């Protein structure tokens, strides 16, 4: 009797371990460039789900590698401490991409109405990149976007 219970428990434990082993999926580690492209794809999918139209063009990303993922605020430090790397990231489109994606992300997170009119107003009033992207105050960019959303009432749908 005792051996039968032990055998059944052993069989259940064996089945459990086989199931766990079969379902194991290793954690995928993305390179900084893959992570950025994944983030970009997710943000653009959000915008697509809201059925809004992009009136600004996202420049092609020609970087072949990134040493890490940068938040927009980090560009302000990079501009001062490593201008060559900053210029490299401008020339390959990375800074412009982060600029626009950060702006889109702020609209997604802070706009009360995710309508086409709201997004159109937001694009026109808040996110026109300057001719020289290096002149942007990256440190305060997110707060500028939030303020622009509130000030210009881009979260209101007009009928």
Curated annotation (Swiss-Prot):
Keywords: Membrane, Transmembrane, Transmembrane helix. It is found in: Membrane. The keyword Transmembrane helix applies. It comes from the Viruses. One of its GO terms (cellular component) is membrane. The chain crosses the membrane at residues 4-24. It is a single-pass membrane protein. This is Uncharacterized protein 325L. The keyword Membrane applies.
């Amino acid at each position: 009797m005792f051996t039968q219970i032990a055998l059944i428990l052993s069989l259940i434990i064996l089945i459990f371990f086989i199931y766990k082993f079969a379902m194991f999926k290793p954690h995928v580690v993305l390179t900084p460039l893959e992570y950025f492209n994944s983030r970009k794809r997710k943000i653009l999918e959000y915008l697509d789900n809201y059925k809004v139209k992009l009136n600004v063009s996202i420049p092609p990303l020609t970087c072949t590698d990134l040493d890490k993922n940068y938040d927009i605020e980090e560009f302000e430090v990079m501009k001062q401490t490593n201008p060559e790397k900053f210029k490299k990231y401008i020339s390959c489109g990375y800074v412009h991409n982060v600029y626009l994606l950060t702006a889109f992300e702020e609209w997604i997170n802070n706009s009360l109405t995710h309508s086409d009119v709201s997004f159109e107003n937001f694009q026109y009033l808040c996110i026109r990149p300057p001719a020289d992207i290096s002149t942007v105050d990256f440190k305060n960019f997110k707060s500028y976007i939030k303020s622009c959303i509130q000030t210009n009432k881009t979260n209101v749908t007009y009928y």
